[in-house]
């Protein structure tokens, strides 16, 4: 048995749109009987389009960068949380006029500071005051800095990792930062699935386009990214490809 793991945004889809090539590749993977996992910073409600729109069978959803894992039957098999006090403190520290901040429960995404652009379809987002959802199980903070340069966003990411190192880990993905509970990463999520399904590292394939994908590259014997990815990401993978479909057809199913 093989395990193919793909990042979602910027890798498998762009704004929930999948190319015909990638859809064909995923369908071939489904038909082969090999396992498919999607590893993303998104919550569950933002991933249902994979089945509803494209008819894809996903064996494992590794959500919130490893904070929540759901199997093909919709059963939660792994879940970690961030305390409300930590969430509130981080938001106070890093919010700015340029930021949009949302928090995730694993099933619902709440925008608690700023507003997303109206011309982008952000499925499943709700707008809510943080105080009103303090009793929810919060598992990820998503920080978006659309007008900041990469160096500035990286500086914010380092600040979070230094100040809150005992509680969380922050990963930068272009102008986004995902903050998850300590011990959570896409790599931990992939490792959990490997152990649960008794799959060897050499039979594990992982593809992504950003720094939060690097931990899962380390859990895969076969790792992939794109020529358009940042150099720091490209140096961590075994293969450079043009698409998810290419990684599936030329490597996983070869």
Describe each PLM feature range.
Residues 20-117:
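Active-site phosphate-binding/coordination module
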Residues 37, 62, 205-207, 222-224, ...:
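Hydrophobic/aromatic beta-strand patches that form the interior of the parallel beta-sheet core
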Residues 46-49, 189, 215-216, 232, ...:
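Phosphate- and divalent-cation-binding pockets in alpha/beta enzyme and binding domains
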Residues 97-100, 104-207, 211, 215-216, ...:
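Conserved acidic, metal-coordinating active-site core of Asp-based
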């Amino acid at each position: 048995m093989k395990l193919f793991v793909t990042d979602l945004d910027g890798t498998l889809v762009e704004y929930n749109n999948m190319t015909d090539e990638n859809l064909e590749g995923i369908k071939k993977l489904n038909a082969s009987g090999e396992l498919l996992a999607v590893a993303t910073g998104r919550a569950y409600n933002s991933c249902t389009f994979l089945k509803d729109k494209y008819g894809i069978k996903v064996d494992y959803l590794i959500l919130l960068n490893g904070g929540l894992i759901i199997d093909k039957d919709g059963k939660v098999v792994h879940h970690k949380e961030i305390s409300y006090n930590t969430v509130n403190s981080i938001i106070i520290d890093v919010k700015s006029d340029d930021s949009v901040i949302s928090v995730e429960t694993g099933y619902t995404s709440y925008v608690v500071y700023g507003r997303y652009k109206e011309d982008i379809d952000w499925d499943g987002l709700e707008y809510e005051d943080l105080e009103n959802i303090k009793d929810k199980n919060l598992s990820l903070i998503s920080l978006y800095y659309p007008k900041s340069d990469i160096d500035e966003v990286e500086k914010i990411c380092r600040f979070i990792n230094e100040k809150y190192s005992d509680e969380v880990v922050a990963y930068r993905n272009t102008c986004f930062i995902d903050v998850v509970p300590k011990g959570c990463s896409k790599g931990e999520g992939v490792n959990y699935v490997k152990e649960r399904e008794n799959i060897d590292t050499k039979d594990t394939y992982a593809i992504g386009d950003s720094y939060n994908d690097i931990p899962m590259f380390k859990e895969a014997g076969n790792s992939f990214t794109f020529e358009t990815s940042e150099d720091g990401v490209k140096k961590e993978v075994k293969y450079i490809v043009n698409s998810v479909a290419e990684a599936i057809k030329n490597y996983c199913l070869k």
